Amino acid sequence: MVDQNPKRSGEPPVWLMFGAGGTVSAIFLPVVILIIGLLLPFGLVDVHNLITFAYSWIGKLVILVLTIFPMWCGLHRIHHGMHDLKVHVPAGGFIFYGLATIYTVWVLFAVINL
């Protein structure tokens, strides 16, 4: 018999952040590595342009997206990876997603104060 009133799960918002983090990591972080790892050291990108971009509102948004979403993805993977390896942390979801939330708030304050 199918339960007519299924219990709601708290997973959809976490899966949203996880999916966004995986997408951001796959698409945009290689570009960041190219800019910071190759173009900047060889002088093909001016440091002052990067700093000016970082202080603009769109730059702050980019910094937020490139730091917050991959952290959610990573902590979600660690949480479920430990579960798959039968390492059950008491209140693991609370710990890992709590750390991700604390990190998110910390990054928000740091970027807003740029």
Curated annotation (Swiss-Prot):
Disulfide bonds: none annotated. The gene is frdD. This is Fumarate reductase subunit D. GO terms for cellular component: fumarate reductase complex; plasma membrane. It holds the Pfam family Fumarate_red_D. It is a multi-pass membrane protein. Belongs to the FrdD family. It comes from Haemophilus influenzae (strain ATCC 51907 / DSM 11121 / KW20 / Rd). HAMAP family: Fumarate_red_D. It is found in: Cell inner membrane. GO terms for molecular function: succinate dehydrogenase activity. Keywords: Cell inner membrane, Cell membrane, Membrane, Transmembrane, Transmembrane helix. The keyword Aminoacyl-tRNA synthetase does not apply. One of its GO terms (biological process) is fumarate metabolic process. Its main location: membrane. The chain crosses the membrane at residues 24-44, 50-70, 92-112. Part of an enzyme complex containing four subunits: a flavoprotein (FrdA), an iron-sulfur protein (FrdB), and two hydrophobic anchor proteins (FrdC and FrdD). InterPro entries: Fumarate_red_D, SQR/QFR_C/D. Anchors the catalytic components of the fumarate reductase complex to the cell membrane, binds quinones.
